[in-house]
Amino acid sequence: MKMSPRAKQYSFELSDDEIDLMVGVPPKRITWDGADARIRAGLLENGLRSVVLPDAQMRDLLRELAGMVQAHALSRMDSDASYIEGLYSKKPWGLARSPAICFTGLQGVGKSQLLQSLAHLLRARGEQMSVRGHAGIDLIPMWLITLAKGDGLNQLLREHVDPAWQDAEDQIAQKNTSAPKSWSVPKILEIAERVSWRHATCLAAIDEFQWITASSSANARAATVLLKIHGIGPLLLYCANFSLVHKLKGRPPEDRDRLLSSPIIMRPFGPQCPDLTAYLKALVAVAPDVFVFEPAKDQESIFLFTFGIRRKIVDLLVAAYKITCRGGGHGKVGVPQMRDAYQSELYAMHRDDVEVLFRQHVSGRVEKEDLWCPFGSTTQVKSNVTEATAIIEAFEKRVEDDFLRESLTPTERQALDALQPQTSREAKPGKVLRFRKGKATKEDLLAGADLLDKLC
């Protein structure tokens, strides 16, 4: 099928290796140069955070998003005639709007990085097109909008539709001029619609949307901003955390249809995911003289400390390094040091989140809305409750055993080591008692009491 350049700019014919080469940031080994422990910890954190390793999920999402945008372009401006007609129309995109894409996931799984990667892939071509009467039109496949500077429409859109705006901001930074006058909302929306059509910009992606959730009126404000940008014409892709999506679910049905009917969820690593192994290997390569764990062997333990979330993995490793350097320590990080970091004050916030995530996964009940996916499960852990429970119980038992072991004297520890194999061989398997669901009767309670007496 022959496509116009407006739709072809979203063709995604790259192999996995080509995607990795274009958007990946390989690990760079740190050179310490005699820095003290505090500086080393900062260098380590920066080095770990800079690693971008595309995985199977990331590549699939990039291809899926590009395909959705290409379909949008094909349905709106594939023929030159329809495109030229739109150039002279006040409403080039028409009145119908496709549902926005709600891109969500746990904080720290890599959503912002994926949007930046998508922007890099689409903008790398730098193509132009020509149609009858119009030559050398720049194709701008995507607007990447951020709320870091504010949530006003001038702050969000002006730099994309008014080239003079960025020049004015640069001059303000140099104290050479005053701030340019803001456009009215109708004016900026009208210009945004026409500029996006002219440059065949079929995707408007909003990142850093968590900035808008700080106010008490976040629900109404977020919906208003999203609906205004959604009404421009390009396909809207907005990155939102779970808490905001829960708030948007309370909006009227027409708002939910526009903003929540097309969700895409980015999930954390699973406990035995090969991509987690590859990611851990990349992190080890940043400081192989520091990290002494084996990624393939120890990744399940690391999953138990982090729930497979990239940001938490990095923060755990940095916290473990800081702790092991205290008092002139050796600065080596293995699983025991990560376990110490997990229990420390440096990782307390993450530890609370991880424990809530595991409990929610097993119980199926909401404890914290900002950690509960509004659209379904977020994990790559199998949904089998027995397996998930076993993972959590193994983790809790391991932590308890370590605490008990640390409290023993050297003599007691040697005695425990001598008894441990024999104890393991003689241990009897636990007995699981299954209780019938339903309302308990007096007879049930009496029977249960008799059973407990026999067991005791």
Protein language model annotation of sequence segments:
Residues 2-33, 198, 270-277, 281-456:
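C-terminal alpha-helical "lid" subdomain
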Residues 104, 142-151:
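A short hydrophobic beta-strand->loop->alpha-helix junction that borders the nucleotide-binding pocket
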Residues 93-116:
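Walker A/P-loop nucleotide-binding motif
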